[in-house]
UniProtKB/Swiss-Prot annotation:
Annotated keywords: Cell cycle, Cell division
Signal sequence interval, chain numbering: none
Family: Belongs to the MinE family.
Function: Prevents the cell division inhibition by proteins MinC and MinD at internal division sites while permitting inhibition at polar sites. This ensures cell division at the proper site by restricting the formation of a division septum at the midpoint of the long axis of the cell.
Matches recorded under InterPro entries: MinE (IPR005527), MinE_sf (IPR036707)
A single Gene Ontology CC term: plasma membrane
GO process terms (BP): division septum site selection; regulation of division septum assembly
Name of the featured protein: Cell division topological specificity factor
Organism superkingdom: Bacteria
Matching NCBIfam families: minE (TIGR01215), PRK00296.1 (NF001422)
Length: 91
């Protein structure tokens, strides 16, 4: 009996594999419609900091590291030594 089962294969693994593939495809399809999270975060952070300090956008680095339990957002902004501040109009 064991030899026949070995030759026929395990029928239970096919539905499990199909379900996993469907989950993976659904996840991938869901990600396509979303904007690039890291790009959006970079632009929004740049806009906020630019209101107060003159900076070079090419000197801003944003990294997102995803872990199993925690994700880390690292923002590296190079600010000039003279710290040229912008004047913010008060309404």
């Amino acid at each position: 009996m064991g030899l026949l089962r070995l030759l026929r294969g395990n029928k239970a693994s096919a539905p499990v594999a199909r379900e996993r593939l469907q989950i993976l495809l659904a996840h991938e399809r869901g990600m396509r419609g979303q904007p690039d999270l890291l790009g959006v975060l970079r632009e929004e952070i740049l806009a906020v900091v630019s209101k107060h300090v003159t900076l070079d956008p090419t000197k801003v680095i944003v990294r997102l590291e995803r872990g199993d339990e925690v994700s880390t957002l690292e923002v590296d902004i190079e600010v000039p030594n003279d710290l040229e501040r912008k004047r913010v109009a008060v309404a």
